[in-house]
């Protein structure tokens, strides 16, 4: 569900940009597929892949600045760790 949640947020942003939902969804899916391909096939770290597509002063860099300002990485990690805690609780019965 985590990835679906991210895709949904990206599609919603596309709709706010004026794209029809179907086109926004297609663009996000293509972006995800391209990203998966690079993660799966490139001999680079995730940090290197991020640097490779985040041009200085570019659009991706602007988005990443907003993600960092909102501490998106920490928020995602907190959610995943909450799921782990809940899984442990459920396994205890």
Language-model features: locations:
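Active-site-proximal catalytic alpha-helix in oxidoreductases
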Residues: 1-15, 26-39
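NAD(P)-dependent Rossmann-like dehydrogenase/reductase catalytic/cofactor-binding core
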Residues: 25-93
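Membrane-interface starts of transmembrane alpha-helices
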Residues: 20-24
């Amino acid at each position: 569900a985590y990835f679906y949640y991210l895709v949904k947020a990206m599609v919603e942003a596309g709709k706010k940009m004026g794209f029809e939902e179907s086109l926004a969804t297609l663009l996000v899916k293509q972006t995800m597929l391209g990203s998966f391909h690079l993660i799966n096939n490139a001999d680079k770290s995730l940090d290197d892949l991020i640097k490779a597509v985040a041009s200085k002063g570019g659009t991706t860099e602007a988005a990443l600045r907003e993600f960092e300002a909102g501490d998106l990485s920490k928020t995602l990690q907190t959610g995943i760790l909450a799921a782990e805690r809940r899984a442990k609780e459920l396994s205890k019965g």
